[in-house]
Amino acid sequence: MTTPLAVIADLVPPGSRVLDLGCGDGRLLAHLRDTRGCTGLGVEIDADKLIAAVQKGVDVLQLDLEQGLSMFADDSFDVVLQIDTLPNIRHTENALRETARVGRLGILSFANFAHWSIRLRLLTGRLPVTPELPYEWYNTPNLRIATYADFTRLAAHCGLRVVQAFGLRGGRRIDFAAGLLGSEAVFCVQRA
């Protein structure tokens, strides 16, 4: 388990029912099951990642998140995770509202485009390539970029309350000036 994922896993209450949107290879759900006694369901569109998750004993549905989460009732889960998923979704507001509808707590993370090193790279006239944003501008899977401050505004716009927010840098939690010093942003949100 990578350190950033371990920090995020610590935010999930033991024994929670967890939905992981864009679960990838199922590593986080398997960790939550094995160390925190959580039950979980992953959603993944990529067939190879889905197979890797199933091989870890994780239950996974192959769904396109752009279609919404209408198959789940309100409050079906204690926690809904979107780890590095939101920048890859076209209908961001709907995805965020659906996260809050089907779960009591939403935990989201994404690369923070306002990190100081990215700001510095932009001064050279080029888009950055970093561990958190490892692609050139022309081949990135990200549909959009986000900042810590922008997400705070989006959450309010969607009628959500931010209950906890911080940055991550090198697996370390950053609480002071998280928008400037955190290369990744982490938010816990609930319906207001």
Residue ranges: model-predicted function:
Residues 68-74:
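Short conserved loop adjoining the S-adenosyl-L-methionine
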Residues 22-24:
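Class I SAM-dependent methyltransferase "Motif I" SAM/SAH-binding loop
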Residues 26-30:
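Glycine-rich SAM-binding Motif I of class I
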Residues 31-68:
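Class I SAM-dependent methyltransferase SAM/SAH-binding core
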Residues 79-90:
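A short SAM/SAH-binding and catalytic strip from SAM-dependent methyltransferases
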Residues 1-15:
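Conserved alpha-helix/loop element of class I SAM-dependent methyltransferases that forms part
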Residues 93-101, 105-192:
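S-adenosyl-L-methionine-dependent methyltransferase catalytic module, highlighting the catalytic core
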